From Swiss-Prot:
E.C. no: 2.1.3.15
Catalytically driven reaction(s): N(6)-carboxybiotinyl-L-lysyl-[protein] + acetyl-CoA = N(6)-biotinyl-L-lysyl-[protein] + malonyl-CoA
Protein keywords: ATP-binding, Cytoplasm, Fatty acid biosynthesis, Fatty acid metabolism, Lipid biosynthesis, Lipid metabolism, Nucleotide-binding, Transferase
Top EC class for this record: transferase
Protein name: Acetyl-coenzyme A carboxylase carboxyl transferase subunit alpha
PANTHER family according to UniProt: ACETYL-COENZYME A CARBOXYLASE CARBOXYL TRANSFERASE SUBUNIT ALPHA, ACETYL-COENZYME A CARBOXYLASE CARBOXYL TRANSFERASE SUBUNIT ALPHA, CHLOROPLASTIC
Pathway: Lipid metabolism; malonyl-CoA biosynthesis; malonyl-CoA from acetyl-CoA: step 1/1
Any GO BP annotation: fatty acid biosynthetic process
Gene behind this protein: accA
Length: 315
């Protein structure tokens, strides 16, 4: 099984393997097999459209965790210029599961903050698999307060299974760090745009997710608990995760219908990992447009709008 494809994508993987095989044969024998390759590519595109046109919530949850999916630093590289990463919470240490710093979106200085997972084993461990400890959230808070001080908009990228639940994180008051961020972000006198690019896991996501505009990529998720966790609680087995994913309403379209998400950002055919540059270009356009809209509001109107947004959640 090709590790770059999930199990429900295997028919696509098989076609891609045939295309690569034909290309190798053509290179070795100087044969003109362009027509056959083009036919298979068209067939692959049609098959991809068919499969991705009827994804279940569980399949979308798995896409959100795809190992090749672009992470925050990938999007920073494509979307922004002059990124200068800042480190440390000025209390305990630096947390590599949260990255942040000053950058430019076109000519506009912005503060960019996001969760960061790892690709290889060592980086996964260093980034703690994208699960921040309290110092990560306190670093994010420090950068957000700096952004307010220098009148820079804040752009956050959410992609985490959740806040780290380890003993050391609890000893340093994980819940307080998250709660403090919610308080601070609700009062910041600068525009905040949050974009869920992969997993939006519980309070670990919400701690950098209080905003004026919430975006979700088409194949991202946002939930109070993972489908496996929910299934383990309700059905006493993680095998019911597909049922839990459907019942929880974790997908972008479902959350848009509930009024929680403002914008669902379309991904390239097959997901953002198939064409990261195209995905980044789409996000960049949305961020620029939304930022231009929010900058028209004065601080009083911005905070009133944010307060109304927060108070509208729930029944």
């Amino acid at each position: 099984m090709n590790p770059n494809f999930l199990d429900f994508e295997q028919p696509i993987a098989d076609l891609q393997a045939k295309i690569e095989e034909l290309r190798l044969v053509g290179n070795d024998n100087s044969l003109n097999i362009g027509d056959e390759i083009a036919r298979l590519q068209d067939k692959s595109s049609t098959l991809t459209e068919d499969i991705f046109g009827k994804l279940t919530s569980w399949q979308i949850a798995r896409l959100a965790r795809h190992p090749r999916r672009p992470y925050t630093l990938d999007y920073i590289q494509h979307i922004f210029t002059e990124f200068d990463e800042l480190h440390g919470d000025r209390h305990f240490s630096d947390d590599a599961a949260i990255v942040g710093g000053i950058a430019r979106l076109d000519d506009q200085p912005v503060m960019v903050i996001g969760h960061q997972k790892g690709r290889e084993v060592r980086e996964k461990v260093r980034r703690n698999f994208g699960m921040p400890r309290p110092e990560g959230y306190r670093k994010a808070c420090r950068l957000m307060e700096m952004a307010e001080r220098f009148k820079m908009p804040i752009l956050t990228f959410i992609d985490t299974p959740g806040a780290y639940p380890g003993i050391d994180a609890e000893e340093r008051n994980q819940s307080e760090a998250i709660a403090w961020n919610l308080r601070v972000m609700s009062r910041l006198k600068t525009p905040i745009i949050a974009t869920v690019i992969g997993e939006g896991g519980s309070g670990g996501a919400l701690a950098i997710g209080v905003c004026d505009q919430l975006n979700m990529l088409q194949y991202s998720t946002y939930a109070v608990i993972s489908p496996e966790g929910c299934a383990s609680i309700l059905w006493k087995t993680a095998e019911k995760a597909p049922d839990a994913a459907e019942a929880m309403g974790i997908t972008a379209d479902r959350l848009k219908g509930l009024g929680i998400v403002d914008k669902v950002i379309a991904e390239p055919l097959g997901g953002a990992h198939r064409d990261p540059a195209a995905a980044a270009a789409t996000i960049r356009g949305e961020l620029a447009s939304q930022l231009a809209m929010l900058k028209k509001l004065d601080n009083e109107a911005l905070l009133a709008r944010r307060y109304e947004r927060l108070m509208s959640y729930g029944l």
